[in-house]
Amino acid sequence: PMRLPSKVHGPRGLGYAELPPSDHRVTDHDSASAWVRAAHAHPGELIGVATGPLTNLALALRAEPALPTLLRRLVIMGGSYDHRGNTTAVAEWNISVDPEAAAEVLAGWGGADVVRERLPILCGLDLTRKVAMTPDHLTRLATAADSGTRPLSADDEPGTRSAAANPLIRVIEDAMRFYLEAYHDLGHGYQAHMHDPLAAAVALDPTLVATRPATVEIELTGTLTRAMTVTDWSGRREPNALIGIDVDSAAFFDRFIERVGPFARRVGGGR
């Protein structure tokens, strides 16, 4: 069954943030079909980014086994490679929600005729925990958006809403405040690891991270180790993934601010 990380990201996944109502309609097809349709429409062009459980991607792979050769690249935020988990002692959240799906996806890419450079890039906890957002980063982001704001602080009352003038910066600050508070309450400091944004950044530029080829399998039957990403670094078997092992954290935040700041300024009606 589907589980939501509400203790960290709030009941709707956006912390304290509230999005304006949308006039967009739900599509007449599901997410698995969307993967397949897009891949067929743009063969060899698209970069897939998976930042949650891999259920829909596994279903897409069942419908179209050639998906690994139809995509230009795949980046997955998930797993923990020679590192502790965040759901159990050894399992990461996204993989733990549907480990069977993760196993299918890795097996599908491993069995496909994919050159090593196009193997999935896996951004696990050992990588994403090196990229932690702080209130200073949010202040820099507001400045890049030409938005006045009040810096977030661990001394603020829980749930304090953003004072930013820019609407997008308000959404980001309200979402991040919940995340920062959750980490602070867990004893991790007033910071928040940027798991999913890092995967998106890697999709844009894989050179942001150093990778190492490996063969990854998902433990499905262990009483204590279910959903563990079992990683064989020996090189004796064909690799099915490129594991992110290091990242330039400063470069990530510079790029994040350089892209999101001006976009927020445009959304807010600025220059």
Put a short name on every predicted segment.
Residues 40-62, 71:
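A glycine-rich beta-strand to alpha-helix segment
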Residues 52, 105, 200:
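Divalent metal-coordination and catalytic microenvironments
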Residues 60, 66-88:
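Class I SAM-dependent methyltransferase SAM-binding "motif I" and its flanking Rossmann-like core
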Residues 65-72, 108-116:
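Short, conserved loop/helix-junction motifs that constitute active-site signature segments
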